[in-house]
């Protein structure tokens, strides 16, 4: 059995979810494929838990739940960049929150990992949206994998699906709902005739919306994901600044009621060909009319025609599903070497 070591950078919601799923699926999935996957380091902003033989996942999750990571026996003062460089590992999971203005600290983490000969899997949208060509080019130069399925659509396997099964197609357009928070709010407003603020407050109480929901409400999150899809699937060379973005702040109960009378709903839609994110009228019987936190993404292709993917676009377990799918993809390539 081949031993493979991971470094987890960023131990927030996605990091914890990834370790929970890894613990759950290790024996059933990974070991059956011939891999003993160990976590060699878990890096947080002020230090790291490091054990070259493999960290006990239960102990790390328990320490995190009680806010006592620093009391873990394997705690070190090594910051993430240092840990990426010195810890013996095969794959770095870059799971930190993204800053769309700078892309940091994700860009530095990804570059350091690739420069040190480590494959990378990331859920961090900002580096992939801002430095797609640079980072994928560096990975190719180093003969390494950079995987980022978890940056778009939660558990929806859109990037890997295209790469593994649909690459014979020319994708003519990508169009869809890419943000579960805004979709939940619009669904709530439409179905229960409540204001945006009322729907937003409930979303925050349920943990669907962040305390500062601006990235979701103003369309930034959708635009970032749109850029990633455009570059990775359609071969475009665009950045966030190329997208015209308008969010849902001005949507009222009156506008939704008017749409309803004419057989429409209003959804926040990302449109690659239009280079735009904006609220749009969608017929009630249209495939994009999905409710709650669901995402729906339509690909129009020259051979396969139109394909619509629907699924949960957020959540720690759903995103962890995509993170570990990318890990397994890398493991399969390592197995063939």
Where in this protein do the model-derived segments appear?
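Conserved anion/nucleotide-ligand pocket segment
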Residues: 163-224, 229
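ATP-dependent carboxylate/acyl-activation modules
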Residues: 286-337
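Rossmann-fold NAD(P)-binding glycine/threonine-rich loop
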Residues: 98-115, 123-163
């Amino acid at each position: 059995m081949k031993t493979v070591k991971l470094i987890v950078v960023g131990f927030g919601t996605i990091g914890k979810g990834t370790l929970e799923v890894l613990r759950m699926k290790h024996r059933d999935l990974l070991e059956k494929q011939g891999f003993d996957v160990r976590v060699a380091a878990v890096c947080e902003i002020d230090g790291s838990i490091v054990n070259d033989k493999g960290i006990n996942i239960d102990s790390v999750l328990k320490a995190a739940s009680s806010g006592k990571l620093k009391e873990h026996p394997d705690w070190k003062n090594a910051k993430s960049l240092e840990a990426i460089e010195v810890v013996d590992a095969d794959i770095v999971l870059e799971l930190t929150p993204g800053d769309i203005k700078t892309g940091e600290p994700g860009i530095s983490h990804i570059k350091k990992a690739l420069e040190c000969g480590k494959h990378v899997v990331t859920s961090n949208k900002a580096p992939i949206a801002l430095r797609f060509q640079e980072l994928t080019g560096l990975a190719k130069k180093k003969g390494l994998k950079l995987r980022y399925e978890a940056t778009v659509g939660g558990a929806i396997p859109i990037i890997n699906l295209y790469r593994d099964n649909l690459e014979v197609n020319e994708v003519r357009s990508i169009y869809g709902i890419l943000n579960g928070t805004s979709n939940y709010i619009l669904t709530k407003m439409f179905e229960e005739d409540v204001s945006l603020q009322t729907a937003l407050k409930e979303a925050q109480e349920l943990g669907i919306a962040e305390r500062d929901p601006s990235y979701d409400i103003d369309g930034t999150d959708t635009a970032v994901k749109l850029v990633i899809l455009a570059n990775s699937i359609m071969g475009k060379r665009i950045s966030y600044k190329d997208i015209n973005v308008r969010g849902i702040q001005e949507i009222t109960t009156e506008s939704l009621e008017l749409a309803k009378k004419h057989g429409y709903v209003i959804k926040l839609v990302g449109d690659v060909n239009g280079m735009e994110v904006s609220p749009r009228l969608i017929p009630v019987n249209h495939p994009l009319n999905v409710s709650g936190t669901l995402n729906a993404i339509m690909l129009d292709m020259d051979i396969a025609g139109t394909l619509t993917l629907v699924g949960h676009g957020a959540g720690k377990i759903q995103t962890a599903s995509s993170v570990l799918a990318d890990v397994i993809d890398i493991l399969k390539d390592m197995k063939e070497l």
